[in-house]
């Protein structure tokens, strides 16, 4: 009998949760009702004012920041707030920064994540229902160069690719600029120029009944930037994106940090924090008490184990365990919760899930139908010690 059947797993191969591998895992958010409700309330309010979410979440490694991002995507796609009048177009990216990265690198990552085909399709749909595409694009972008480049995205071949390179912020040669009928490369005027183009794309999305929202993970990467001018340009890009006037491009940024001061300095400067709003900086802490650990584990087991099959197995094999803690005996479950809570900084979702999985694998390897205290005593110190 394989591992899945051994523990009556519900359509999965292990106790591991990873929404990057299994998108359906995004629906899970165990043991943190207060934080979940707070973030969702902030999201709902954000579509009223400023019109899109602008938020930073932070916590230690393994605290569940990535799961939070994917869960928020699941929420927006399945329970879209009434105040969001367009369909959310949600895009994930893991930020990558090196010592000399600047606003151009950040902009490129955002635009490339969005993709040429998406923006071109928006322009095509706009063209199909407007009498004057030039006028519409100038109204959307508020800039002649951006409107001309956007119009060229409809073209196939080299000219369409050239227009996309312009929006990505590449420096174009004079003859390439002439082909696009633009007077300069995007970004020649600085970081704000690139933000204006991105916000213009957001307004284009709105004309197509979509709301553009970026979910950016691993923002601790900003600490890799060592050049002063590069850091300032990144800060300017974020400050401009956080301006109240931007109601078209939303963002939720996730960063490793034990406190606000642990984050990259550009994320927490006063001018950024006042624009984003102090209540939109949300900590994802470890589980604070043994009771919270118990709730997390029970909710996890209830979701990942097929309850009817497990109940039948418990009865047929006289396992003498409760369905609430299966496949752990009551004593083993208590021992695991105690280990996890000894050091509050280690009571993290990643550690708890790993402990459950490792204990289950050990029991399966020994052909034991349930997890007893001796297995927990062997595994838990390696994870929480």
For each predicted feature, which ranges?
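Glycine- and acidic
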Residues: 24-25, 53-58, 220-224, 338-341
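Alpha-helical scaffold elements adjacent to nucleotide-binding pockets in ATP/GTP-utilizing enzyme cores
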Residues: 38, 42, 67-75, 102-114, ...
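Alpha-helical repeat scaffolds in large eukaryotic proteins
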Residues: 44-47, 73, 77, 199, ...
């Amino acid at each position: 009998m394989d591992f899945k059947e051994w523990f009556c797993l519900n359509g999965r191969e292990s106790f591991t949760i990873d929404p990057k591998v299994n998108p359906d895992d995004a629906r899970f958010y165990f043991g943190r009702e207060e934080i979940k409700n707070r973030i969702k309330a902030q999201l709902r309010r954000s579509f009223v004012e400023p019109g899109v979410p602008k938020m930073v979440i932070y916590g230690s490694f393994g605290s569940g920041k990535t799961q939070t991002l994917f869960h928020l995507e699941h929420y927006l796609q399945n329970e879209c707030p009434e105040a969001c009048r367009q369909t959310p177009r949600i895009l994930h990216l893991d930020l990558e920064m090196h010592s000399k990265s600047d606003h151009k690198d950040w902009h490129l990552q955002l635009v490339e994540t969005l993709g040429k085909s998406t923006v071109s399709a928006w322009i095509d749909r706009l063209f199909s229902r407007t009498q004057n595409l030039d006028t519409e694009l100038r109204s959307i972008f508020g800039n002649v160069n951006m409107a001309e480049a956007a119009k060229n995205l409809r073209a196939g071949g080299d000219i369409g690719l050239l227009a996309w390179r312009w929006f990505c912020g590449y420096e174009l040669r004079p003859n390439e600029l002439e082909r696009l009928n633009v007077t300069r490369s995007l970004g020649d005027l600085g970081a704000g120029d690139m933000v204006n183009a991105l916000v213009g794309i957001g307004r284009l999305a709105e004309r197509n009944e979509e709301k553009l929202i970026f979910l950016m993970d691993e923002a601790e990467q900003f600490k890799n930037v060592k050049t002063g001018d590069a850091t300032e340009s990144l800060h300017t890009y974020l400050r401009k994106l956080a301006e109240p006037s931007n109601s078209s491009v939303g963002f939720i940024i996730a960063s490793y940090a034990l406190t606000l001061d642990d984050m990259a300095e550009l994320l927490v400067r006063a001018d950024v924090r006042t624009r984003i709003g102090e209540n939109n900086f949300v900590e994802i802490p470890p589980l604070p008490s043994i009771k919270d650990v118990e709730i997390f584990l029970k909710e996890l087991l209830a979701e990942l184990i097929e309850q009817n099959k497990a109940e039948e197995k418990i009865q047929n094999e006289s396992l003498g365990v409760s369905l609430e803690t299966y496949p752990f005996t009551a004593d083993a479950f208590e021992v695991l919760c105690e280990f996890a809570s000894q050091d509050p900084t280690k009571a993290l979702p990643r550690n708890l899930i790993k402990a459950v999985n490792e204990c289950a694998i050990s029991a399966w390897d020994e052909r034991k139908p349930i997890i007893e205290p001796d297995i927990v005593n062997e595994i838990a110190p390696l994870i929480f010690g």
